[in-house]
């Protein structure tokens, strides 16, 4: 198990990652931006507080999300790099999508041009088709769960409600 280290200046480090500002909040904790202490690479860190994962359904949900994130490898699906565990939390170290939510992108622009919307749709279809080939159903696709990278490419995130299935 890793340790949480709080420096004199107030910065928190877990494993090889320095925790930064909050990016969002979820059922079991929050998502923060992080920086790898050796490489300087920016990452998203989903902090899951173990004391909020109370019943069997919660444990199953978190385990299923982690299992799914471990097997998916597609340019449109956010990548899980590693998991750091402490006594009180699980830290899911993931790919950081700097562009934020597709929802905010659309709201800020008030509209999306047809060519750009088609690009988003094709990327989304590519990601969903890949997930379905693996027998994974996301079950919570919405603009808030579609993030964007530096080049405005879609990244599917938040597999908390996802499940696996066998065709037939």
What are these regions (language model features)?
Residues 30:
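Conserved N-lobe ATP-binding subsite of Hanks-type protein kinase domains
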Residues 83:
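Activation-segment/catalytic-loop signature of the eukaryotic protein kinase fold
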Residues 88-101, 105:
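Conserved short submotifs of the Hanks-type protein kinase catalytic core
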Residues 120-121:
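Activation segment signature within eukaryotic-like protein kinase domains
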Residues 42, 47-72:
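Conserved N-lobe beta3->alphaC-helix segment of eukaryotic protein kinase catalytic domains
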Residues 124-136:
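Protein kinase catalytic-loop region centered on the HRD/HxD motif
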């Amino acid at each position: 198990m890793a340790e949480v280290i709080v420096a004199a200046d107030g910065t928190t480090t877990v494993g090889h990652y320095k925790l930064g500002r909050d990016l969002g909040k979820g059922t079991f904790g929050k998502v923060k931006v992080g920086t790898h202490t050796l490489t300087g690479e920016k990452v998203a860190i989903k902090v899951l507080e173990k004391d909020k994962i109370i019943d069997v359904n919660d444990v199953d949900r978190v385990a299923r999300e982690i299992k799914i994130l471990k097997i998916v490898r597609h340019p449109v699906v956010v990548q899980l790099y590693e998991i750091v565990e402490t006594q009180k939390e699980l830290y899911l170290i993931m790919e950081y999508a700097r562009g934020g939510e597709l929802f905010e992108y659309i709201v800020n622009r008030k509209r999306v041009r047809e060519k750009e919307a088609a690009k988003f749709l094709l990327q989304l279809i590519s990601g969903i088709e890949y997930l379905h080939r693996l027998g994974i159903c996301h079950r919570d696709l919405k603009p808030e769960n579609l993030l964007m990278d530096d080049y405005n490419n879609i990244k599917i995130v938040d597999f908390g409600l996802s499940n696996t299935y066998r065709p037939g």
